[in-house]
Amino acid sequence: MRAPAFWSESGLLPGLLAPAAAAYALGSALRQAATRPVKAAVPVVCVGNAVAGGAGTTPIALSIAGLLKGMGRKPAFLSRGYGGRLGGPVAVDPALHKAGDVGDEPLLLASAAPTVVAAERPAGAALAVELGADVIVMDDGLQNPSLVKDLSLMVVDGGFGFGNGRVMPAGPLREPLHRTLDRADAAVIIGSDTTDVRRALPGGLPVLHARLAPVGSDLSHKRVLAFAGIGRPEKFFETLRAIPCDLVATHAFGDHHRYHPDEIMRLVEAAAQAQAAPVTTEKDFVRLPEDARPMVRVLKIQTEWQDSKAMEDLIARHV
């Protein structure tokens, strides 16, 4: 899904949805209370967020795994595999699995470290240990109570923050913010804090800053037709503008959108007519029909920490 515009507003519609939001929050609280967390055989680092619609957890999880490898550890990723048909636990094999099997994020994660998809996280953690992991990095799952987390990172998009501060469906929050903050060991703010995220955080909560930067791009000053089916496609479009690209058209689809071959051909033809390159995200690229991939450019990004040593020290203290 795409984040509705009213999730950033405090108008009539969020107020009308307040009863549904209260029911959602109650259901979340009951689930937390009814679940006894399981302690995995190895430490667990959870990279999650407070809102629906994406905040950049996957690139942060990839970076955390890279830092762990630099510290001599053997990380494995654990993911729910949103959008995939396999409940798992299953070890992701990019040569065998497609996004329809395991979801798009796990395919990206599997290029960096062993990756397990599991609806039941404790079973997934056990498989990750069997695969040789001495530390598990959970991509998302801050609200999932089934595993004990040794380090919980709350990732926040500095350009979106916590929206209107309301719980779904009245706003973007997965639960009342204070509950998420209670279980977070640190916050990671991605990009410029234009929504005053820092003010909403407890004074004693460690805060780290990072940005998602293009890597290996040769799109500078090129004509580009951009398309994306992610939580906040505007972030992708703004990244392209900042390169800078000449963005001739943008097409936004729902999060985890499954592309039809005809859909891609229309985009490719529109790009050709505009004398532009069709460009998408890494997450979208793995969801494209295989025959269409050679016709589409992909913009790769990486995490750049304001202070990577602070992140390494935080990891070392917890795992």
Predicted feature residues:
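Residue-level signal for inorganic ion chemistry
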Residues: 23, 58, 109, 139, ...
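A transmembrane-helix-recognition feature enriched in membrane-embedded lipid enzymes
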Residues: 1-43
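Walker A (P-loop) phosphate-binding motif
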Residues: 29-97
